[in-house]
């Protein structure tokens, strides 16, 4: 009886399910495994969750303790064990999703409650206005009640702790009324849709003083960790130059009060930087929530009176901060409010949108903070794995150093050692030198070995009708269009030697080939960190055997076609090929800032939809983001390049730097005209090719030819015509490419998946040829099938590996090529469809 009970109840204690009893295989009852047997099986499972038949046989021979178990029972045990593992992982995933949905639902309920209060308030105001209109005499009522006004809070004495505590408590109250109440009229930020896949709810102010933004979301970190990260503003806010706590004392209620001085970088050479003198109050609420609130102290004379402060305009921070509430089951709900008055009067009128747009504040500060803590949460949980085995914190530090070096060059603060040099009478390029930027010890990360210093040549220019994301992508993908390889080699050589030879002493030639290796990216691809290898070729026989490749560490911001950022950047610095963690960085690059940032408009970084991108000569009005907004888009481009120099070569390097930046400005102007929708007649800057049909016509030819040659439809609703068919082709799940039917086929068209596979854009597509994307085996397979392609009109290619435009390997399961016939039944081009492709 005891044995029978053990057999019936044993299935739950074997760690993975049992096998059939040897004594009664037909009884259908499960065997109860002993703890020793389970331990032996678990050891094997840890090494190999799915052992082969021979491996299971070997297991039975090697473990006498399993001798009484049949191979079939062992197989069933492993099957059950794998099933339980899968169920456990799925249950864990569903629990995490459920926690996120619960927290998001709580946020939405709170937001709904706030909106209901706001609606109620508006209803009362509307009723009052109707009453005023119906009874005009009430508007002139001089009774005591009608003249009641809210008394202004008296100025608090900020010179003693009790006065500061009063200010802190007022700041807390005002901040909470903004974070969870109706003190500010919040409107949803365009393009931000709440939901399980969204990183949070974002809103911007409407009709209040200054500019304000609010964000709230769920983050899988403890509240104390989140507060620690957010208080370290320079670690996540790229525009923050420094933050110094001058005074800190306890508030008496478990909180702390700090007097903080913060400096911000200037976004461009055309405006002065900002600084803040604030009180920061950190405390714990009764419900366990942590609060950090901050506001400017009255008076513009507060804070340190240093020489560097003369280069800043004092801005005001209205009650702002962070509310972090612990969440059931782990994680936290974070509320972030930024409310600033950036003194827009002090900048040229054309640049004032940068200081008068709540959306800019939302993108540069509020959502940046939320994305940063979400990024760290994912890194902490192990969800993010980066190349080269680098730790996420190290790669994040590289991004910060690249950005900080570029900001230092643009702002050129005196206390950093920068001073402006005399010009040549034409004030288009600013030349500044910095003799302090010399590495004397190994701890100075952004300096380097040279007996002189650094020359920085920088310029700013206004752009009209140039999509920022398209421009930055073009500069990234087509370096040979604007860069001089000798100048890259000059900067790179300073990392290896203590001397800085002028370019031209060892003439080099850029092969035109660059290989980009991704290192890291943020959660939503706002930033991409990568290493670029430029292949150089020596022009003299003596240098022929020496490697002349140059490696650059590069940071790209906002190049994603769906980016909604307020800043688009390409920043790079030469590095040693060994790429040590403490590599010195001399940052140079480009920054494009849209000036037409509207809180009620579409994002400046538009999505390049195919219908509007490839129309040639069409008079139809484009739809969606690619409307006339791009033709009227204004932005400011800032260029800054740094060059090391030896003291006796300072003037020569300055002249060289000025001429080089002027040549870059000319190249950028030429590129801008080429990609401008208003000038080229193409909404994405696509070059006009002789004989190239309008996009809807080409889409129809592609689908009709596919059906003609293969006898099946490429698209389910191929009967559609015009832009509807074009949109379906653009959204097709596999990569579709078209190349010219010539001796050297060049790509002329690709759908969205095709552009993603090639890692290029519609602007740069035609610079890729068919032979460049196949390796040797792929080219051989293609050439062998060309006669068959010409004879029957199509051919299937076996799965293999091809190359993207950036040199990355791409595997595909199968490819099909077919001839695309025009209206006259002549071959117009060749089309390829790559099925189930992925990066290796």
Curated annotation (Swiss-Prot):
Keywords: Coiled coil, DNA-binding, Homeobox, Nucleus, Transcription, Transcription regulation. It is found in: Nucleus. It comes from the Eukaryota. Expressed in seedlings, roots, stems, leaf sheaths and blades and panicles. SUPFAM superfamilies: Bet v1-like, Homeodomain-like. Residues 157-385 form the START domain. The keyword Coiled coil applies. Residues 12-21 have a biased composition (Gly residues). Residues 86-135 form a coiled coil. One of its GO terms (cellular component) is nucleus. Residues 1-26, 135-160 are annotated as: Disordered. InterPro entries: HD, HD-Zip_III, Homeodomain-like_sf, MEKHLA, START-like_dom_sf, START_lipid-bd_dom. Residues 26-89 bind DNA. GO terms for molecular function: DNA binding; DNA-binding transcription factor activity; lipid binding. Belongs to the HD-ZIP homeobox family. Class III subfamily. Probable transcription factor. This is Homeobox-leucine zipper protein HOX9. It comes from Oryza sativa subsp. indica. The gene is HOX9.
């Amino acid at each position: 009886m005891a044995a029978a009970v053990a057999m019936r109840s044993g299935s739950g204690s074997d760690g993975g399910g049992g096998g059939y009893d040897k004594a009664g295989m037909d009884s259908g009852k499960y065997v109860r495994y002993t703890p020793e047997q389970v331990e032996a099986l678990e050891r094997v499972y840890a090494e190999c969750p799915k052992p082969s038949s021979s491996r299971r046989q070997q297991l039975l021979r090697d473990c006498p303790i399993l001798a009484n178990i049949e191979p079939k029972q062992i197989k069933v045990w492993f099957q059950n064990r794998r099933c339980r593992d899968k169920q456990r992982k799925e249950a864990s995933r569903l629990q995490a999703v459920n926690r996120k949905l619960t927290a998001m639902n709580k946020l939405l309920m709170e937001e709904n409650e706030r909106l209901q209060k706001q609606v109620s308030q508006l209803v009362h105001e509307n009723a009052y206005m109707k009453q005023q209109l119906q009874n005009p005499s009430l508007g002139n009522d001089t009774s005591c009640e009608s003249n009641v006004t809210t008394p202004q809070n008296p100025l608090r004495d900020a010179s003693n702790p009790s006065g500061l505590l009063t200010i802190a408590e007022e700041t807390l109250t005002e901040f909470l009324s903004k974070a969870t109440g109706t003190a500010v009229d919040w409107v949803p930020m365009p393009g931000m849709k709440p939901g399980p896949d969204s990183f949070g709810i974002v809103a911007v102010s409407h009709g209040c003083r200054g500019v304000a933004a609010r964000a709230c979301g769920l983050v899988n970190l403890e509240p104390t960790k989140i507060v620690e990260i957010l208080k370290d503003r320079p670690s996540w806010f790229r525009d923050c130059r420094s933050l110094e706590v001058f005074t800190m004392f306890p508030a008496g209620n478990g909180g702390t009060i700090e007097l903080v001085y913060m400096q911000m970088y200037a976004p461009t050479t055309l405006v002065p930087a900002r600084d803040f003198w604030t009180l920061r109050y950190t405390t714990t609420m009764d419900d366990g929530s942590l609060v950090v609130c901050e506001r400017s102290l009255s008076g513009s004379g507060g804070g340190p009176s240093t020489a560097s402060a003369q280069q800043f305009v004092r801005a005001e921070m209205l009650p702002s901060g962070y509310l972090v509430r612990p969440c059931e089951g782990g994680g936290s709900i974070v509320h972030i409010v930024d409310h600033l008055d950036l003194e827009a009067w002090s900048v040229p009128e054309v640049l004032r949108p940068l200081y008068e747009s709540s959306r800019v504040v939302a993108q540069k500060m509020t959502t940046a903070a939320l994305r940063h803590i979400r990024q760290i949460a994912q890194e902490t949980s192990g969800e993010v794995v980066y190349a080269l085995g680098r730790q996420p914190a190290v790669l994040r530090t590289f991004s910060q150093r690249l950005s900080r070096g570029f900001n230092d060059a643009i702002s050129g603060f005196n206390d950093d050692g920068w001073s402006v040099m005399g010009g040549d009478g034409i004030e288009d390029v600013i030349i500044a030198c910095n003799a302090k930027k010399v590495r004397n010890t190994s701890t100075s990360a952004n300096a380097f070995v040279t007996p002189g210093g650094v020359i920085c040549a920088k310029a700013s220019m206004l752009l009209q009708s140039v999509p920022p994301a398209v421009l930055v992508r073009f500069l990234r993908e087509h370096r040979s269009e604007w860069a001089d390889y000798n100048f890259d080699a000059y900067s790179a050589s300073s990392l290896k030697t203590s001397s800085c030879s002028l370019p031209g002493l060892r003439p080099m030639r850029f092969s035109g080939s660059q290989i980009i290796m991704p290192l890291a990216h943020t959660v939503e691809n706002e930033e991409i960190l990568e290493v670029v290898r430029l292949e150089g070729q020596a022009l003299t026989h003596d240098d022929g055997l020496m490697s002349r490749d140059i490696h650059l560490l590069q940071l790209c911001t906002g190049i994603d076609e769906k980016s909604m950022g307020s800043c688009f950047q390409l920043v790079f610095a030469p590095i040693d090929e060994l790429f040590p963690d403490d590599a010195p960085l001399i940052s140079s690059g480009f920054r494009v800032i849209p000036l037409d940032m509207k809180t009620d408009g579409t994002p400046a970084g538009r999505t390049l939809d195919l219908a509007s991108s490839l129309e040639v000569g069409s008079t139809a009005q484009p739809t969606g983001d690619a409307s006339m907004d791009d033709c009227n888009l204004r932005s400011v481009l800032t260029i800054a390049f740094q060059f090391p120099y030896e003291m006796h070569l300072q003037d020569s390097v300055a002249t060289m730097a000025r001429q080089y930046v002027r040549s870059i400005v000319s190249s950028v102007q030429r590129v801008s005209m080429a990609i401008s929708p208003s000038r080229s007649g193409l909404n994405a800057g696509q070059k006009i090719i002789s004989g190239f049909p309008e996009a809807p016509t080409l889409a129809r030819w592609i689908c009709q030819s596919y059906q003609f040659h293969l006898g099946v439809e490429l698209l389910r609703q191929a009967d559609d015509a015009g832009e509807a068919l074009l949109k379906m082709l653009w959204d097709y799940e596999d990569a579709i490419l078209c190349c010219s039917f010539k001796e050297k086929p060049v790509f002329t068209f690709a759908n969205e998946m095709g552009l993603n596979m090639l890692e290029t854009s519609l602007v740069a597509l035609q610079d890729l040829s068919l032979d460049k994307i196949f390796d040797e085996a792929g080219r051989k397979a293609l050439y062998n099938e060309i006669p068959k392609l010409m004879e029957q009109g199509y051919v299937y290619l076996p799965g293999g590996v091809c190359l993207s435009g950036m040199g990355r390997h791409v595997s595909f399961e199968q490819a099909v090529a077919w001839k695309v016939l025009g209206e006259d039944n002549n071959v117009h081009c060749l089309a390829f469809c790559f099925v189930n492709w992925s990066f290796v």
